[in-house]
């Protein structure tokens, strides 16, 4: 009987290659993350040999980011995040603006159009969440003031990219692309742009409010129910269900990234007695 083993094969080969790459990188006195990246390239579609399913790999990567950001959120409280807002908020906005402008200028030098230049600049303006957090953990800086500022910076970048991804389709006509408007929409582009932007900001605001008000009560309560059963398995399952479920619901209902939803889930849990 033939079985579909795409998921098993990509997990098995991925873990084996990541282990080998991490060990080799450690022997060369490099961060293991370098070996993990090389392992990903080795089983990717642009190198000979085994090629992992890109769709499955992407979803597994998202799952890894969800669990990573949930764990990072457990190290933070809402007070920690608010304490660095005066640095992280303006700093991230200025950095995104400057990096986007520099990237767009470089693209203009390559002869690219305005739309391609803007997308290229935005891609250069944000940091890799996984790489930065792993580097902070490796240096023991995640729980320091610098680490909190860096995480706050990442949150601002994530929110900024949510807005950017909404605005880019609406701005496509003026940037040399094609508009992506909903079927049946015949209003003026300006009206559609501002309505879309307003709805996006409202969704993000509602998401933050729901997590800070409802999540601070609901998540600890549900985990408390699991803890009182005395079953370690049920408690672990409740934690995983909270991280993945909230991340998925946040993306589907409010349009935020999986990583941001998982981070807020971990952060609200950090303020409960069950965070350890």
UniProtKB/Swiss-Prot annotation:
It comes from the Bacteria. It is found in: Cell membrane. It is a multi-pass membrane protein. GO terms for cellular component: plasma membrane. The chain crosses the membrane at residues 5-25, 32-52, 64-84, 104-124, 149-169, 193-213, 244-264. GO terms for molecular function: antiporter activity. Pfam families: Na_H_Exchanger (PF00999). Keywords: Cell membrane, Membrane, Transmembrane, Transmembrane helix, Transport. Gene3D superfamilies: 1.20.1530.20. The keyword Electron transport does not apply. The keyword Disulfide bond does not apply. Its main location: membrane. Signal peptide: none annotated. One of its GO terms (biological process) is proton transmembrane transport. Belongs to the monovalent cation:proton antiporter 2 (CPA2) transporter (TC 2.A.37) family. This is Uncharacterized protein in phaC 3'region. It comes from Methylorubrum extorquens.
């Amino acid at each position: 009987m033939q079985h579909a083993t795409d998921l098993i094969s990509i997990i098995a080969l991925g873990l084996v290659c990541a282990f080998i790459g991490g060990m080799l990188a450690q022997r060369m006195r490099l961060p293991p993350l370098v070996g993990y990246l090389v392992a990903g390239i080795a089983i990717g579609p642009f190198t000979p040999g085994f090629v992992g399913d890109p769709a499955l790999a992407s979803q597994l990567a998202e799952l890894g980011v969800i669990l990573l950001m949930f764990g990072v959120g457990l190290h933070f409280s809402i007070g920690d995040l608010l304490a660095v807002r005066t640095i992280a908020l303006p700093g991230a906005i200025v950095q995104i603006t400057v990096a986007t402008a520099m990237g767009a200028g470089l693209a203009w030098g390559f002869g690219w159009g305005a739309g391609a230049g803007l997308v290229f600049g935005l891609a250069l303006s944000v940091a890799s969440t996984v790489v930065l957090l792993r580097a902070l953990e490796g240096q023991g800086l995640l729980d320091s003031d610098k680490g909190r500022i860096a995480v706050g910076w990442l949150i601002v970048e994530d929110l900024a990219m949510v807005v950017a991804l909404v605005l880019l389709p609406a701005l496509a006509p003026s940037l040399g692309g094609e508009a992506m408007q909903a079927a049946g929409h015949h209003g003026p582009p300006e009206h559609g742009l501002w309505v879309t932007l307003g709805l996006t900001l409202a969704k993000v605001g509602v998401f933050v409010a729901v997590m800070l008000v409802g999540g601070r009560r609901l998540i600890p309560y549900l985990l408390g129910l699991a803890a009182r059963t005395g079953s370690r398995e049920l408690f672990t399952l409740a934690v995983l269900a909270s991280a993945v479920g909230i991340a998925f619901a946040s993306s589907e209902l409010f349009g935020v990234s999986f990583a941001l939803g998982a981070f807020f889930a971990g952060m609200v849990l950090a303020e409960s007695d069950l965070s350890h």
